[in-house]
Amino acid sequence: MGGGERFNIPGQHRNNLGKQINRQKLFDRNNQKMNTSHTKDRGRGCGTSLAWQAMQNGINNNAFSPNQNWSAGFPASKNLFTDEDNQNYAGAKFSEPPSPSVLPKPPSHWVLLSCSPAEKELMSFQLKTLLKVQA
């Protein structure tokens, strides 16, 4: 058993659903054919739009003239970054090496307990060398 959930859809609803989908497809096809035939009958496809009429009549819209001074609407570029240049960036500085206190320490299960202090010093030096970023 265990076939999962099943929806009980009576047979009549399935047939009606298929008929509705077929009707919608037929309507969409007929509607597309009617729309294309209307544009062919008019001759010019976009001849009745307001923009087309305005272009034909030679109406000039001064809101978008080509000689408009666009830089007047924007602040001067020299004033954009002057205040930010004087502030210090709080993030990491990659030109300076990190301090040893912020370097990660190896997990305790990596280090044997029988290591001498000299061996621990050597391992920490090797770890710092591996983590050093070369400029």
Curated annotation (Swiss-Prot):
<keyword id="KW-0804">Transcription</keyword>
<keyword id="KW-0805">Transcription regulation</keyword>
<feature type="short sequence motif" description="SH3-binding">
    <location>
        <begin position="95"/>
        <end position="101"/>
    </location>
</feature>
<feature type="region of interest" description="Disordered">
    <location>
        <begin position="1"/>
        <end position="46"/>
    </location>
</feature>
<comment type="similarity">
    <text>Belongs to the PNRC family. PNRC2 subfamily.</text>
</comment>
<keyword id="KW-0866">Nonsense-mediated mRNA decay</keyword>
<dbReference type="InterPro" id="IPR028322">
    <property type="entry name" value="PNRC-like_rgn"/>
</dbReference>
<comment type="function">
    <text>Involved in nonsense-mediated mRNA decay (NMD) by acting as a bridge between the mRNA decapping complex and the NMD machinery. May act by targeting the NMD machinery to the P-body and recruiting the decapping machinery to aberrant mRNAs. Required for upf1/rent1 localization to the P-body. Also acts as a nuclear receptor coactivator.</text>
</comment>
<keyword id="KW-0539">Nucleus</keyword>
<dbReference type="GO" id="GO:0000184">
    <property type="term" value="P:nuclear-transcribed mRNA catabolic process, nonsense-mediated decay"/>
</dbReference>
<dbReference type="GO" id="GO:0005634">
    <property type="term" value="C:nucleus"/>
</dbReference>
<feature type="compositionally biased region" description="Polar residues">
    <location>
        <begin position="13"/>
        <end position="23"/>
    </location>
</feature>
<protein>
    <recommendedName>
        <fullName>Proline-rich nuclear receptor coactivator 2 A</fullName>
    </recommendedName>
</protein>
<dbReference type="InterPro" id="IPR026780">
    <property type="entry name" value="PNRC1/2"/>
</dbReference>
<dbReference type="GO" id="GO:0000932">
    <property type="term" value="C:P-body"/>
</dbReference>
<dbReference type="Pfam" id="PF15365">
    <property type="entry name" value="PNRC"/>
</dbReference>
<keyword id="KW-0010">Activator</keyword>
<keyword id="KW-0963">Cytoplasm</keyword>
